């Protein structure tokens, strides 16, 4: 079995060659999805009306988010897209990926990095270890150059701690991580949803991230090789979170996939993520990113169906390709499909080969 160590910290930076090779190799792995992407073009959904994303920083735009320990010596090159240039979003971690003895080094690394961050398409977030570390990060020069923060162990019992240090004036967005035992309590999740609304945080939240490994740890479980997260007890918890948060307008992103040598299982899991209404996924290695994002490409049939549903002159009920379409009940699905198509493209169908 091959092993990859994303968290190696050699000082000369040459170790990224392996990651870069894996990055390009993984583009070949992604071909096992057996899909071809249609040429890029302006997306339309009726007449000459173009579909426009509701927000330039959306849960969909994050794609596969790569976690990196903030102790890495090559953080600057990745943050400024000199390494892994195809990356859509990155989260610099000062929590689980950094030992307590290395925390100050991680913060020093970020303090040196932030003023030198260049403008570009890469979406950059920081995962603070705790509210105290968040407060320290907010004092750093250049902190306004990151898009926001992924808040770990987020729940009703920690919400007040985060809010006490939160500075809303800098325009940062939030990625709260749901990974405590409270996730298994339906009522507590409803309470937290209501508190987010009461405190006016909803507009700041890009998505709520599901911390799969922390939740499995609470159950004393690690998924076996070949299993998706939906083959574990978390299937019910994920469905419950979707039922609590999605109707209120929040988006949920999917947990990490632990294995690097079973891309076919990763593909199966991402397809199940989408079926459960999840958007985006955390990646533990660059090799996973093209595999994950290949699954986000929209099948042409779905794209054309979504465009027809959102057309201004769409009938109240109609049939398309032997499927029942009702704009009043399918609108949110259709909007999500066109958002994915805008970001990741449309998968060509058989008719496009002629």
What are these regions (language model features)?
Residues 2-354:
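Expand to "…catalyze enediolate/carbanion chemistry for C-C bond making/breaking, isomerization
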């Amino acid at each position: 079995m091959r092993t990859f160590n994303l968290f190696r910290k050699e000082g000369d930076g040459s170790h990224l060659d392996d990651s870069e090779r894996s990055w390009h190799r993984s583009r070949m792995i992604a071909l096992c999805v057996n899909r071809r992407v249609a040429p890029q073009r302006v997306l339309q959904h009726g007449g000459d009306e173009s579909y426009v994303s509701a927000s330039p920083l959306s849960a969909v735009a994050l794609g596969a988010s790569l976690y990196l320990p903030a102790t890495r010596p090559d953080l600057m090159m990745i943050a400024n897209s000199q390494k892994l240039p195809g990356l859509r979003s990155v989260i610099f971690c000062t929590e689980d990926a950094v030992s307590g003895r290395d925390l100050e080094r991680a913060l020093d690394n970020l303090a040196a990095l932030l003023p030198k961050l260049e403008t570009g398409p890469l979406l950059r977030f920081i995962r603070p270890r705790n509210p105290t570390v968040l407060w320290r990060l907010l004092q750093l020069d250049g902190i306004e150059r990151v898009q926001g923060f992924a808040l770990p162990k987020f729940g009703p019992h920690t919400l007040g701690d985060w809010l006490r240090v939160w500075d809303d004036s800098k325009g940062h967005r939030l990625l709260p991580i749901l990974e405590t035992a409270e996730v298994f309590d339906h009522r507590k999740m409803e309470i937290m949803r209501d508190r987010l609304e009461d405190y006016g945080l909803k507009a700041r939240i890009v998505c709520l991230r599901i911390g799969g490994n922390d939740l499995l740890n609470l159950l004393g479980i690690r998924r076996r090789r070949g299993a998706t997260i939906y083959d574990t007890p978390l299937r019910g918890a994920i469905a419950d979170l979707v039922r609590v948060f999605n109707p209120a307008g929040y988006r949920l992103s999917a947990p990490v996939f632990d294995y690097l040598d079973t891309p076919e299982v990763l593909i199966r899991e991402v397809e199940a993520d989408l079926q459960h209404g999840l958007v985006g996924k955390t990646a533990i290695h660059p090799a996973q990113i093209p595999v994950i994002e290949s699954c986000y490409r929209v099948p042409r049939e779905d794209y054309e169906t979504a465009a027809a549903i959102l057309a201004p002159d769409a009938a109240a009920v109609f049939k398309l390709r032997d499927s029942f379409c009702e704009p009043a009940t399918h609108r949110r699905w259709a909007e999500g499909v066109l958002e994915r198509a805008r970001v990741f493209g449309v998968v060509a169908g058989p008719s496009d080969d002629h």
